[in-house]
Amino acid sequence: MSDIPFWQTKTLEDMTDAEWESLCDGCGQCCLHKLMDEDTDEIYFTNVACRQLNIKTCQCRNYERRFEYEPDCIKLTRENLPTFEWLPVTCAYRLLAEGKPLPKWHPLIVGSKAAMHAERISVRHIAVKESEVVDWQDHILNKPDWAQ
């Protein structure tokens, strides 16, 4: 049996569903709402978390049934990955699609999410609950480093 991790030997297309799912580092960046300018199609990042995101753990409260609770939730697949230009530069799906390695803090490498949180990759330090937002425009972020 090889000691080389699956993400270094398989393409995204060749990964099993379990391998595909395990690539997600659980940072929660995908679960922050984005606003789109209707005239320019420019995407603005906010710090407003989806109602299903547990901000402390950066995990979806209802992952298996998320589309029932959040019809606008978008499922990232092998087929639609190229259309998600807004994925963070730290996203394993994006990195592997671009032929780049996983970052040293990635949970698949270090075995836990602690390093990711320590590096402030996760949204737990910036996210606010959707229910607490009055004016969404007040929550637009300058383009975060992770979105470059």
From Swiss-Prot:
A Pfam entry, by short name: CxxCxxCC
Domain of life assignment: Bacteria
Family: Belongs to the UPF0260 family.
Family annotation (HAMAP family): UPF0260
Name of the protein in its database record: UPF0260 protein YcgN
